[in-house]
């Protein structure tokens, strides 16, 4: 029984296997028309047919490689009548060729005129390399660029930005060329030479501590390319693990296309680096709001300091604009008229008509000059000493002065009052701009208390509920106890006999008693010092414990015991029984 061959795309060898697999015993039943038709046979029968067939076994893969079994290529004039058998095209070794190096029993014929290639006159064949006995091939030791084995895990750029300029006089390239180096330029570490023989258990290290004049500046390796040396016989060993390279080494270099070296740029970059040292707190809270943009160009000031001989002049960058608090411009008044280049207005007050035709506001007549006042007459009648009369007279003048200041802001005529201020006939509601207190009012020094509301006439009477004896100001929130003028039920009975009855006690209590303080509070240029707030006394008056006690007293609810367990979930007890019994 002859073996039927399959498709001819495989190598021309005897098909079949020594042991047929189980998938080929009944291939027509399981996989019909999918494989080549092949009758099955037993193993012994197959070996008999294989040995009976006499065929020349060729090298494996000869047809599928360069120079394998190909038909003989001959020109048309040399073409034989019958086609010659196939032979090996070329016999010299090629990589991937599965046959023998030098084929035997088959001649090697090469026809160079079939192509444009020309046969070499030096060698006997077309090989460019000489034969091994005549070749002189040697190793070439030349460095080649390499990368560190951990190059993929090394940052390609600088991790932290730098503000140093290559033109800097202290950290730039010019500073690296000077020796000894300034303290602002880092230097390389000391070189270490390790002397150790292979197999020797001891390690000998030689440390070289160079002098300051022989130190080298610190630079990053790998600025251009790393080169490695191959393993040669009589050469140095290669550097297996060089220092980690960086694709962009942060070494500074001067721009050759920019010959102008500007020292201002170096100064600006230095100040820019200093500006990053300012904390966010100092930047946002300066006392006058956030910080304004900084002035980074102070090269002129540093040049002047260098010429004048100042050593170490390197100030911190300052703000371009310093904020200042400017008061608002008044719309009217004395200051507004001065800003508008207008003549300031003078206060015009109506003088009280004199009862004596010979008296003037400044000069009195002869009669009133020598006639004693009512106070002096009362003092003579009561036999009061002269020194007490003098003190009472000073008190009377002081009260008159305060009442005269208060008379500038008199109430309308519908509220007639009986006090010393109504002795002068002044227009009601005078303008503040017509007085000489505009500047004091602008600087918030004229802190006037509102006028007291006196008793009105029966025609203007409005029925109100009876309230406690408090002085009602225009602001209903502020209440105070009655002052000196309201100590008696009727203002008509007010005279100086109350002051003259106890002169010593009145003199001592004028400064200490709160009721005898100036009516207008503090008046500028009135001879009274401005009252100061005692912050320490106010601070000591506060008690944290007392505040907590008042807070706890304000809470009306009962204190909760943290040990009590409050169940905020669903209710499980109904009428004293658990819900389990109701469901079952």
Swiss-Prot record:
It is found in: Cytoplasm, Cytoskeleton, Microtubule organizing center, Centrosome; Cytoplasm, Cytoskeleton, Flagellum axoneme. GO terms for cellular component: centrosome; cytoplasm; motile cilium. The keyword RNA-binding does not apply. Disulfide bonds: none annotated. Keywords: Cell projection, Cilium, Cytoplasm, Cytoskeleton, Flagellum. Microtubule inner protein (MIP) part of the dynein-decorated doublet microtubules (DMTs) in flagellum axoneme. May serve to reinforce and thus stabilize the microtubule structure in the sperm flagella. This is Sperm-associated microtubule inner protein 4. It comes from Bos taurus.
